[in-house]
Curated annotation (Swiss-Prot):
Belongs to the TADA1 family. This is Transcriptional adapter 1. The gene is tada1. Pfam families: SAGA-Tad1. Signal peptide: none annotated. GO terms for cellular component: nucleus; SAGA-type complex. CDD domains: HFD_TADA1. Disulfide bonds: none annotated. It is found in: Nucleus. The keyword S-adenosyl-L-methionine does not apply. Probably involved in transcriptional regulation. The keyword Transcription applies. Keywords: Nucleus, Transcription, Transcription regulation.
């Protein structure tokens, strides 16, 4: 792995020296290509425009180093075998036999596979290499290689030289936790839940709902002791007062059931864009960055928009005019 890191740093240094003052423009174009704002051909054209004819190879070497770093396809060459002598130790020495030239040559030469030390590549579908797939297209979390590639480009854009494996692991865990917070903000608007220590939400979708017409139902929920019941606790333990007896826990459960309504809530439809919009509007702290929040709210509102009948008719008329102009007939 250290070899690929040194190769990437060397390729980046060579490319930066070849670009000179155009290095910021190159990082901006690289970021646009990773975001799929421009195609690979457009990125290559801009790179050739910023580089001279003698330094175009630096652009290719840098892209190859990034792809090699992200893929991490390192294949260790197999052993070449032993070249020890054919004579066995401990064998009584007899009369020395003169071997022929052919026997000496067979003993010294061992055939080797010329591709044994070559790097192995996984075969891919040709259609997968045509476009860069993003998370918004695949509807799945990015792989470790994709996330590391994005982090490398961002690091180069801010003047950093490299990205460590620990940083990629931290960003992966942070991404998973952020998505869990978004799901919690959406589900908490649809299902009832309980609180632990006044802030931790759990037991989503519990069937026991407070009965608003009973005065003691609110008190039963507010005075609920959130502790796991145990049969016995050691005397003198520091947390012995926080445990409750199983009989007390059973009495609390019976009281909650008696203070709850007899009608269960109907099953809800799947989560849609309206639920996501409401969850982000109520729980504004789910996305702390105002720029990211505004951009995602705009995307959600665009997904909720749909054309009316007049707009559909105008679109059909426009398509017919384009087809007539091109000499095509619509069936």
């Amino acid at each position: 792995m250290a070899t690929f890191i040194s190769e990437l740093e060397a390729a980046k240094k060579s490319l930066s020296e070849a670009l000179g003052e155009n290095v910021k423009q190159y990082w901006a174009n690289l970021k646009l290509w990773f975001k799929q704002k421009i195609s690979k051909e457009e990125f290559d054209i801009e790179a050739r425009r910023l580089l001279t004819q003698e330094n175009v190879h630096s652009h290719n070497d840098f892209l190859l180093a990034i792809l090699t770093r992200c893929q991490i396809l390192i294949s260790a060459p197999e052993g070449t075998g032993s070249l020890n002598s054919a004579t066995k130790p401990g064998k009584p020495k007899g009369k020395k036999k003169i071997s022929s030239v052919r026997q000496k040559f067979d003993h010294r030469f061992q055939a080797q596979n010329p591709l044994a030390g070559a790097q192995q590549f996984v075969s891919r579908d040709p259609q997968e290499d045509d476009e860069l797939k993003l998370c918004s297209h695949t509807m799945s979390l990015p792989t470790r290689g994709q996330l590391e590639g994005r982090m490398i480009v961002t690091a180069f854009e801010h003047g950093l030289d490299n990205v460590t494996e620990e940083a990629v692991t931290i960003v992966t865990c942070a991404l998973e936790k952020h998505l869990k917070d978004l799901l919690t903000s959406v589900v908490s608007r649809r299902k009832a839940y309980r609180l632990k220590d006044g802030h931790f939400r759990y037991a989503f979708g519990c069937n026991v709902n407070p009965q608003p017409y009973l005065r003691n139902s609110v008190a039963a929920y507010n005075q609920l002791i959130e502790c796991p019941p145990v049969f016995s606790s050691p005397t003198g333990a520091p947390n012995s007062g926080s445990y409750i007896h199983p009989d007390d826990a059973e009495q609390q459960a019976a009281l909650l059931l008696a203070c709850s309504g007899d009608n269960l809530t109907a099953s809800l439809p799947p989560v849609n864009m309206y639920d996501l919009l409401e969850g982000l509007q109520v729980h504004r702290e789910a996305i702390p960055s105002h720029t990211v929040y505004a951009l995602n709210m705009e995307r959600i509102l665009m997904k909720l928009w749909h054309p009316n009948t007049e707009e559909l008719q105008q679109d059909e008329i426009h398509r017919q005019r384009l087809a007539a102009k091109d000499g095509l007939l619509l069936c």
